[in-house]
């Protein structure tokens, strides 16, 4: 993960770049919230249902907070934008696991792939923020990192309880590998891999 010197007033990202990233993050949070809400009725395990319901609520708050930040950066409020069609394909693959017996695949998609990926990007963005106009975004992303980490921790416990055989462990590993391939092909939530990302060329503040 790239680390940046936050002592410079200029920062790494322009206002316009920050807007694009926030729209990307909002897309991921909104899609994740909607797919998990749709899965609640399809999931037989009560503990998983209850945890999903709580996380749907918190992800809805994340979506709203990101959307409200946009007009403060001179952009239209509550807009979600995927970085590219390949990322949409990745998200569709996670969401399409709608069979009664697909709980393992659903949890793998969220807690082993999507949420850890978002945490990585949010954390990287936090290290690169402009200290003049970005403190509100810092607070939002800081909150998202902490809450998404808690989501992953609780979701991983639920997933591990379901992995009670070698066959189920193999199912989980194969699905994780498939999703990671799709995610890598998309370049991630902003269209770039977090580990390899370099700051985009500044395009101005208006």
Model-derived features with residue positions:
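Amphipathic alpha-helical assembly/interaction segments
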Residues: 8, 67, 105, 109, ...
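Helix-loop segments that flank and shape redox-cofactor active sites
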Residues: 31-54, 120-137
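Extended, helix-rich structural scaffolds rather than catalytic motifs
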Residues: 167-206
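An amphipathic alpha-helical core segment
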Residues: 137-177
């Amino acid at each position: 993960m790239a680390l940046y010197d936050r002592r410079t007033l200029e920062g790494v990202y322009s206002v316009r770049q920050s807007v694009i990233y926030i729209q990307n993050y909002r897309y991921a949070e909104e899609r994740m919230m909607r797919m998990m809400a749709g899965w609640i009725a399809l999931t037989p395990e009560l503990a998983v249902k209850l945890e999903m319901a709580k996380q749907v609520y918190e992800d809805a708050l994340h979506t709203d907070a990101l959307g409200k930040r946009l007009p403060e950066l001179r952009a239209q409020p509550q807009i979600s934008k995927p970085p590219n069609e390949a990322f949409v394909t990745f998200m569709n693959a996670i969401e399409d696991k709608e069979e009664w017996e697909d709980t393992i695949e659903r949890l793998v998609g969220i807690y082993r792939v999507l949420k850890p990926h978002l945490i990585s990007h949010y954390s990287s963005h936090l290290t690169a923020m402009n200290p003049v106009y970005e403190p509100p975004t810092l607070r939002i992303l800081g909150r998202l990192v902490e809450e998404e980490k808690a989501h992953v921790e609780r979701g991983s416990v639920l997933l591990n309880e379901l992995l009670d055989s070698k066959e189920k462990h193999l199912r989980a590993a194969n699905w994780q590998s498939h999703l990671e391939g799709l995610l890598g092909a998309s370049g991630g939530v902003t269209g770039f891999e977090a580990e390899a990302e370099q700051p985009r060329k500044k395009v101005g503040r208006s």
